[in-house]
Amino acid sequence: MSHYIDLNSDLGESFGNYTLGMDSEVLNHVTSANVACGWHAGDPLIMEATVKMCKEKGVAVGAHPGYPDLMGFGRRKMAVSPDEARAYMIYQLGALQGFCNQYDVELQHMKLHGAFYNMACVTPELADAVLDGLQAVNPKARAMVLSGSYIAKEAERRGIPVIQEVFADRGYTEEGTLVPRTEEGAFIKDPQEALERVLMMVQEGRVVTNTGKTIDIVADSVCVHGDNPKAIAFIKYIREGLTKAGVIVANFQHR
């Protein structure tokens, strides 16, 4: 049986005169893009340019909404009510949906950013509000969420198409969550080690945690980051390794 996998990356995170990442190069190697929607990063011109580039390169577009936290790049926890979270979703997804409509591009999915992503994995009322917002804007869009998390299970219960996401360059805890960025084992920097972990997740449905324990995991899409000079070589190494192993790399619009 052939294994399929999507490769996604967070893009469109520049702002005004400030450039972050190497989006044009990253888009040559990934199959799905998570486009920042202006609150943790990005702005209207960046959003439009990113959607246009995705269409030109045949990369699927997803919304990447975050908390309203430019200074903290959306990585700081915020205490928001369910009503606020739902409104945040509608506001940001609605903006990106407009650019998708302009260029006749399907909004394939939604993936939360930073603290919004992590908190929605373990906070039921926040996850519920996020999914309410997604369904309000685009009921057909998929939810790209941390594999095995609460929000993944709730989305499935609602009948929302789910993309179970795993990470090429992050460590996992025994609970299936990501090792916090401030702790040892949070990042996988060696490309070969990362590739071996990705192949185990994709082909065997397992991952080794930071304690050495092996846990089950479902991998529909692998996140690769493109915000540093070594990132392009890292992404290329992962994609070539997957292809050599017989894994078909494609987004969800080309299966």
Tell what function each PLM region has.
Residues 19, 23, 33-40, 71-86, ...:
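Glycine-rich tight-turn/loop motif centered on a GG-T
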Residues 10, 64, 110, 224:
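Conserved, mostly hydrophobic/aromatic
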Residues 148-206:
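Active-site rim beta-loop-alpha module in soluble metabolic enzymes
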Residues 141, 233-255:
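C-terminal domain-boundary segment and adjacent tail
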Residues 69-109:
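Glycine/small-residue-rich loop that forms an oxyanion/phosphate-binding "nest" at active or ligand-binding sites
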Residues 100-108, 205-216, 248-255:
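Flexible, glycine/charged-enriched surface loops at secondary-structure junctions
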Residues 16-22, 41-53, 121-128, 147-157:
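Active-site-adjacent beta->alpha loops and helix N-cap segments on the catalytic face
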Residues 24-28, 49-62, 101-104:
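Acidic (Asp/Glu)-rich catalytic clusters
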